[in-house]
């Protein structure tokens, strides 16, 4: 049994070798000749999987170690009788922590408290729900918009997108990319929406590039609209609009979900799905794969305020470390993908063990996802 895996999927060689012969290949472009005798294909979001790639090939199963699936023609796979699995929620925590790292940086730079801001969350799935929970644990007001969930009657106080635009100081997008249909998200943030944002608002896109109309956004910024922008995703990736990058406050190469934990979850989820598909079901404990974190433990004295939280968050991950490298190489062919391929290891907040002498600080840090314990000062 031959299994092709994206060369940038961590732990894929070790895990899938339990099930068959593993060949690691680049994801963009994928070497088509390797598909001629392969039984399974494991990809990331950079690989378009459709009829033109797989027609006439012996592939029986496709797995994507990503939460999003807009790079997969699921309808064709089903029609062709090819098994499929994604990894929903695998990188949700990573994306939430990327948003926090960005917001805390902007708050420090511009001198505001997050408690004074209302956050509008567009898309309330695995990422949106976790973001809502962590913001509300800090006492920050959130507004939710998710028309598909609202129409299904899912639990939640859902508002219209127009209401979020009117009332939110921060608008952050966490939707799939739907190019048509009743819940179309292509250019959901169009020129009209962008121009309608509150003066001084913060716009964040960490889902799919085309959810925000990049041309319209650049037009608004060039005209001097007072707006802070955080973009992790771009229309036309791996190409991007260099002029837009110059105008945004934070720009990164589609790495919001790139924690070691998130990548490992993605790999293990598709591994478990494929093992079940072939009748050799196996389960993997994530902590058996992950290395020891760089920072073992730290001690925190006193209550948890915003500057202290910012220091803790940026100790684990400071978004500026990914902004600067992109600006250095933007516009050079191949460099966007190279930054992703050679991405510096990044951990989640749970990897940081925090000893607190303040019980409320320990409790709040646990709610936020840190590994925190209370030890009273002596």
Swiss-Prot record:
Residues that bind NAD(+): 146, 175, 232, 257
Subcellular location per the Swiss-Prot or TrEMBL entry: Cytoplasm
Record has Cytoplasm as a keyword: yes
GO molecular function terms noted in the UniProt entry: 4-phosphoerythronate dehydrogenase activity; NAD binding; protein dimerization activity
Keywords from the UniProt entry: Cytoplasm, NAD, Oxidoreductase, Pyridoxine biosynthesis
Main location: cytoplasm
Catalytic reaction list: 4-phospho-D-erythronate + NAD(+) = (R)-3-hydroxy-2-oxo-4-phosphooxybutanoate + NADH + H(+)
Residues given in the record as substrate binding sites: 45, 66, 258
BP terms from Gene Ontology: 'de novo' pyridoxal 5'-phosphate biosynthetic process; pyridoxine biosynthetic process
Broadest EC class assigned to this enzyme: oxidoreductase
Active site: 208, 237, 254 (proton donor)
SUPFAM superfamilies the record matches: Formate/glycerate dehydrogenase catalytic domain-like, NAD(P)-binding Rossmann-fold domains
Pathway membership: Cofactor biosynthesis; pyridoxine 5'-phosphate biosynthesis; pyridoxine 5'-phosphate from D-erythrose 4-phosphate: step 2/5
InterPro entries according to UniProt: D-isomer_2_OHA_DH_cat_dom, D-isomer_DH_CS, D-isomer_DH_CS1, D-isomer_DH_NAD-bd, Erythronate-4-P_DHase, Erythronate-4-P_DHase_dimer, NAD(P)-bd_dom_sf, PdxB_dimer_sf
Function: Catalyzes the oxidation of erythronate-4-phosphate to 3-hydroxy-2-oxo-4-phosphonooxybutanoate.
Family listed: Belongs to the D-isomer specific 2-hydroxyacid dehydrogenase family. PdxB subfamily.
Subunit structure: Homodimer.
PANTHER family: FORMATE DEHYDROGENASE 1
Name assigned to this protein: Erythronate-4-phosphate dehydrogenase
Gene giving rise to this polypeptide: pdxB
């Amino acid at each position: 049994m031959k299994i092709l895996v994206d060369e940038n999927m961590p732990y894929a060689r070790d895990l899938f070798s339990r099930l068959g012969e593993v060949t690691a290949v680049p994801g963009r472009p994928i070497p088509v000749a390797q598909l001629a005798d392969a039984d399974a294909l494991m990809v990331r979001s950079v690989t378009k999987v459709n009829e033109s790639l797989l027609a006439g090939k012996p592939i029986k199963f496709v797995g994507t170690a990503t939460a999003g699936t807009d790079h997969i023609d699921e309808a064709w796979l089903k029609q062709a009788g090819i098994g499929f699995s994604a990894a929903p929620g695998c990188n949700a925590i990573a994306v939430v922590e990327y948003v926090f790292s960005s917001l805390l940086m902007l708050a420090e730079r511009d001198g505001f408290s997050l408690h004074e801001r209302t956050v509008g969350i567009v898309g309330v799935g695995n990422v949106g729900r976790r973001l809502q929970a962590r913001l509300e644990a800090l006492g920050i007001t959130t507004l939710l918009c998710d028309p598909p969930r609202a129409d299904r009657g899912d639990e939640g106080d859902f508002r219209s997108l127009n209401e979020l635009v009117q009332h939110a100081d921060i608008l952050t997008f966490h939707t799939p990319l739907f190019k048509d249909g009743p819940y179309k998200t292509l250019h959901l943030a169009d020129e009209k929406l962008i121009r309608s944002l509150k003066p001084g608002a913060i716009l964040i896109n960490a889902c799919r590039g085309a959810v925000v109309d990049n041309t319209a956004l650049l037009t608004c910024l060039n005209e001097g609209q007072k707006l802070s922008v955080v973009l992790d995703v771009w229309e036309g990736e791996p190409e991007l609009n260099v002029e837009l990058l110059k105008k945004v406050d934070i720009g990164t190469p589609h790495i919001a979900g790139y924690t070691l934990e998130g990548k490992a979850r993605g790999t293990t989820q598709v591994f478990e799905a494929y093992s079940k598909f072939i009748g050799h079901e196996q389960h993997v404990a994530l902590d058996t794969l992950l290395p020891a974190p760089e920072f073992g433990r730290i001690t925190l004295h006193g209550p948890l305020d915003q500057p202290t939280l910012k220091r803790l968050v940026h100790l684990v991950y400071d978004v500026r470390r990914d902004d600067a490298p992109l600006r250095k190489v933007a516009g050079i062919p191949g460099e966007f993908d190279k930054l992703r391929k050679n991405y510096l290891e990044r951990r989640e907040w749970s990897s940081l063990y925090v000893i607190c002498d303040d019980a409320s600080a320990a409790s709040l840090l646990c709610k936020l996802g840190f590994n925190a314990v209370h030890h009273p000062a002596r």
